[in-house]
């Protein structure tokens, strides 16, 4: 919160209406005397309401002697004078028990908080209508750097306010996952309850925070805990109606038939809260019918469709049949009938795959998230190989031996690099071995003012190296993340980027060679004795009917040549820039938003010209650089055309072209801190000592002629480090860019 904006004190009851455990009603009010019923209206369930009219009492006290106002705006100089003149102490309390530390904490005045603590302020003093500690005030504004400072100085995280909420409950209600990560590493019991038996998981489920629900469940929270009214987290999630929360709870084994004290099951709650549609969909996504029972499929298919290994193989091999069926129908039937029959057959086979996906494990419910697309390529590659071995090779080897040898070499190379790119670890950032190690990492990031979404992953619980990104498909952070490619069903990162580039280059060359070979092959074949075509002329008809299957297959792979060429061009340009696809699409930048002049101004605002005392980094970065920035969980809707544009890499191609043709001086363009010039960038990529055929050391690569490890790169190389710092591009999520 800006120091120039009047702050507010948490009010004791304004945010408590809505969550209750009365056995006679669906949860309604927390801490209220007579719990109201939850209606279908938007019942705001907040613990503390911060009204803008609440601020430290002003009266006629001059600003220079108003200790509360001085604490609020963070003026250390005047505060020091008050202490020197013995007018106040750091433990001064007003008539409500509020201390200067409360006001400094809620206004994110890090330097003032540290100053007060160093002067003996009681870190656990309770005050205000809510009888809360400074740490609680800070937690309700998600000022987790302040919370960390107070915890370091002895703040007790298990203290409760007048309504029985501790700091974990307050942090959960505001939904900040980073604050929860900090608190859970303070040995706070994950299932600690409030006065009415609500756990943090219940609050997260009620508020509809999927990231917080996931965090609590991964931390070991009891998914079937019950409060004083007998409600479980699943009941609370259905009150809010958040599909991701409900689905996550069911996946973790929530009791689908648990009843409250007044006999209400989750289904009953869903009906009363008008969230039945969410309830049914979550059940379906997790493999249950509308009654909550496990779906039973005919012919014993249930066990097969629920088996991830079996379904992975099915989705990969099914397109082999689809490609063959489409090519066969188009090549063996009259064109008027072939096209509609081929479309019906193709969509029919795809419908089977989609129905199988609807009963598969939850991560396979969307066809694009399965190995289906990689199977399309593998099937095409397989039938090209079969056609070449049994048709093209015998007819052309004697007349075109060199061309055949070249094609065979590039076909084998394409297959090898494809399989390697698909099966190799793309560069997953190693996870820490224990929670104690996680805590050490978190403390180190706090010391460096880097505990934020750009430097720490709340899913993997690891420090994110530069150029890394968390892949939702792989559920891991990937070093030097390029993109998640559905055509290889794997991420492309530090370990397999070169193999991926070699794969598409060999594919490009292989397609061109095969087209030349099949042209020579068709010319060698004798023309059919009798032939009749409905559309094309007689001469072309005779040419096509010599081997229609091979020609249709040629047409299919020629279409693939278009997007493969664009993909090759994009990757080669990015290699010359030492840039990944993700960086290309989201922008490489040095963060110059906090130059030295702003650092100085911030230090003055904090009441000191010392960067250290003001809680600023050497580059002027404040102690809370990204805390006010919210994170949207609302996914973008993409049309069919845009989805295929992403899948085929067309959007990346045009983005690269626009960047190359952009007007304006180069000095105005975002700087790439990893570029060493075109020649050096290309040499680093292609002359990397890692083997072309075999695994490389995880995370290693060359940068400026030196071996670096992207698994452990947390600082920009000094050669490019000036007055700014590198800022990773972890804002949007183009998971399907190729």
From Swiss-Prot:
Membrane-spanning segments: 315-335, 337-357, 373-393, 402-422, 499-519, 549-569
Topological relation to the membrane, as annotated: Multi-pass membrane protein
Family note: Belongs to the DHHC palmitoyltransferase family. AKR/ZDHHC17 subfamily.
Cytoplasmic compartment residues: 1-314, 358-372, 423-498, 570-738
InterPro entries for this protein: Ankyrin_rpt (IPR002110), Ankyrin_rpt-contain_sf (IPR036770), Palmitoyltrfase_DHHC (IPR001594)
Residues of the active site: 485
Name under which the protein is recorded: Palmitoyltransferase akr1
Organism this protein belongs to: Aspergillus fumigatus (strain ATCC MYA-4609 / CBS 101355 / FGSC A1100 / Af293) (Neosartorya fumigata)
Organism phylogeny: Eukaryota, Fungi, Dikarya, Ascomycota, Pezizomycotina
